[in-house]
Structure formats: C-alpha cells, structure tokens
C-alpha cells in the first residue's frame, strides 16, 4: 500500500491491518531454445523505459537490439512481452527495474532534468510503446505461449509461471543472480516483492468467515503449505511468527509502519 492510499483510507475513517503473507519474484524469461539473458538491472531498465537521457534531455528510447545497450548482450531485437498498466506485476517491475534499477543508478539518467515531484517517477516508470515492449494482457499463460512460439522474445511475469513451465522456459540472470526459489526467499534476487493482505477493521465480526480466512493463511504459508506449492515464496519462520501475531492482535496500520 502506498502512503497516499493509506491517507485516503484515513480520511474516510477506514482502519486497516497490513499482513505480509510471502514473497514473489518477477522474472524475465524466454524459451530454452533461445539465448539465456544475463543482464544488469540498470541495462534492463534502459532497454525498456520509454525515454532515455541524451545531452541532459530525455528522448524516445532509440535502442533496437540488446547489444546496442551493452556489447555483452545478444545481437537480437529487443522484444519483450509483459503485463498491462493495470497489473500489480507491471507496477512492481517498473518501480524495481526502470525507476530504482536504471533511473536511480545510471549517471546520465541522474544528471538529466526530470521535473518536480512525481514527474520523475512517472517518466522513469513509463514503458516503451514502439514494439520493443508489448502488452500481452493479464493472462501470463498467453505470454508463455508467445515465448514458446518465438525463441528470440522475452516475457515478464511472476516466478510461479517460470516454475510451472521450467521444462520449456529459462529465467534471465539479473545482476548475476538467477531467479530461483532459494534466491528469492533469501532476498538475493533483487526483482522481488513482498505480498500483503489488508484487513478492514469495520469488517471484523461483520463479514462471515473472515476470522477463518485469516487463520487459513497461517496454516498454509510455510515451506510445506499449499501456497508454496502454488508458487508463493514463504517468509522466514521469524516473519511468519511476527505476522501470525498481527493476525491475532490486528494492529492499526499507520504511516510510520509503511516507511
């Protein structure tokens, strides 16, 4: 949840409890018939962001092939399928890769004028619309299908889809780290996100089954639980204990907690 979303809830008298339930990695993958991509987070953001800096100004991204960004990358057209703007996976990817991985690290991007306030964030988070990045809808299985049809294309989706299709797909190494269960769980893989649920206090004791719903998270979020089998990366035992306590006590979410 973003601070402005919590502020909106507070203005409307809505009290919430935030409960972390696990982790998910975001991968860029391709067919095993193609070239395994080994790329830095900065170069990946540079390949996909709509605008790049040139002489202190922002221009339309001119790069057509991966190796134009870095000679170590494949001499192939940049063609990446991914989720639309309505997707949480898309929102996390552009924040972690385009904004924090590229704009915040690249010396030319840092030097270029970005405007005030969130104009900087919006510019960095915008994805290309010239065919290098192709929106493929909310269904990740459609992206998987595209990748199996085109070995030179890459796709962006959650780790669970890579895990479920590991017989035909391979995950790119980002900043020298492969997207594996172990690397995501240990926070070594940098393109990952925490997963949360939010409990509205006004629903407690009113919505039938809410208490049981929360208890079921505790029963199923361990390494041996069904959520792990479905692709969610479990929290450490210490974190599970912390959020199990939160389910029992339901502390009110505040701006300080979000920081």
Give names to the regions the model predicted.
Residues 1-259:
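Flexible loop/hinge segments at secondary-structure junctions
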